[in-house]
Amino acid sequence: MKTVTDYFGDLVFDDRVMKATLSAKVYSSLRKTIDEGCELDISVANAVATAMKDWAISKGATHFTHWFQPLTGITAEKHDSFITPSPDGGVIMEFSGKELIKGEPDASSFPNGGLRATFEARGYTAWDPTSYAFIKDNSLCIPTAFCSYGGYALDKKTPLLRSMEALHRQTIRILLR
């Protein structure tokens, strides 16, 4: 029989999983992004995306979703599949750093699914690496912020992240006086 300590956090891509699945260089760069807000290089994002995908698939996930909290008061998700058709009729499992970092929740670029042109899309999701990804119902849930293309917050997380950054900046300013 499994105990709580055996399965607690088992479906979370947390620091333990990152250390185990990422190279030391990639892990260090990701930690710098998380801890200091440094920009994430696309090669690091690709390595993290590959590790996340492999880990998620090993836990039974077949899809990923950018998970966010719009101002409606409930969570929202846009699901995509890891599965991509291959030229020989089979499938390959793919997930890129670009897909990890930024998503498009309103489907404006879908061939038949969008209600508006892509340039009219109301916003996009952006990965928040300070929150751990997790698996729910066989989907890798990637915590994201939801912003308009003009930079306006369209969710509850963006103001929190911005206030944390402002508080950090002012604390450093006061401490270095």
Show which residues each predicted segment covers:
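Flexible inter-domain linker/hinge segments
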Residues: M1, D10-V12, A166
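N-proximal short alpha-helices
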Residues: K2-D6, S29, G37, A133-L140
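Active-site core of metal-dependent hydrolases
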Residues: D6-A121
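Glycine-rich, acidic/polar active-site loops that bind/position phosphate-bearing ligands
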Residues: A126-R177
